[in-house]
Regions:
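Conserved NAD(P)H cofactor-binding loop of Rossmann-fold oxidoreductase domains
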Residues: 28-34, 184
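Rossmann-fold cofactor-recognition segment
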Residues: 1-5
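A short, exposed helix-loop element centered on a Lys and neighboring polar residues
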Residues: 60-61, 112
Length: 210
């Protein structure tokens, strides 16, 4: 439960107790609920910040402590890495999903701060995909159409994202930066979030003629 700070703080110690040690954390789980300027509220922002910003920071903090404990116990080579999944929309703004976007922007900034604070034992890298998976808000046909909106003919795939995360975890020279793995989809200007474009088009087509 990422809304429960005690549960979040207890997660990594439970993993370590089961597996013995841990080298990396990939923060990929995210809350993604729609709001905009008209419906924005303290409650919506706080909910997203807890899940999408505070939880990844606490897990990075816990990994750093675990690596420090290993080093203190004699593991001179103890190192760790954190990968935070972000979103290309941070570089291609639209007014939808305001609280989600703010929470991801805060996580991107936190990545830079953590890269400085947790060095040299723990590296922190962001990975920002484009439209990768469909949702209940998009038909298969609409997803295929939107996925093709990229200078390279398609957006990222799960395999693209996984390969980039693996690269970030293995390359010891990368920290404090974000790898955009969106096939430059961020360069395609859109007026609304991809996940809503199908629904909005449908509502427009079904609207009665005045």
């Amino acid at each position: 439960d990422f809304d429960d700070e005690a549960a979040v703080r207890g997660l990594l110690p439970r993993v370590v107790a089961h597996f013995g040690h841990l080298d990396a954390v990939v923060n990929s789980a995210s809350l993604f609920e729609h709001d905009d300027a008209a419906t924005f509220s303290f409650a919506a922002l706080e909910k997203h910040l807890r899940s999408n910003t505070a939880t990844p920071v606490l897990l990075a903090q816990a990994l750093h402590q675990h690596v420090a404990d290993r080093a203190a116990a004699g593991d001179a080579d103890a190192q760790g890495a954190v990968v935070n999944l972000l979103d290309q929309k941070l570089w291609n703004q639209n007014p939808d999903f305001m609280s989600y976007t703010l929470s991801k922007a805060a996580l991107e900034a936190a990545g830079t701060m953590l890269a400085l604070a947790l060095a040299p034992r723990v590296r922190v890298v962001g990975v920002a995909p484009g439209l990768t998976l469909t949702s209940h808000m998009l038909s298969d046909e609409k997803f295929t159409q939107l996925h093709a909106l990229s200078p390279l003919g398609r957006s990222s795939t799960p395999e693209d994202v996984a390969a980039t995360v693996k690269f970030a975890l293995e390359n010891q020279s990368i920290t404090g930066t974000t790898l955009l793995v969106d096939r430059s989809q961020r360069l395609i200007t859109v007026e609304s979030d991809f996940s809503l474009m199908g629904a909005r088009r449908l509502r427009t087509e079904q609207a009665p003629t005045p």
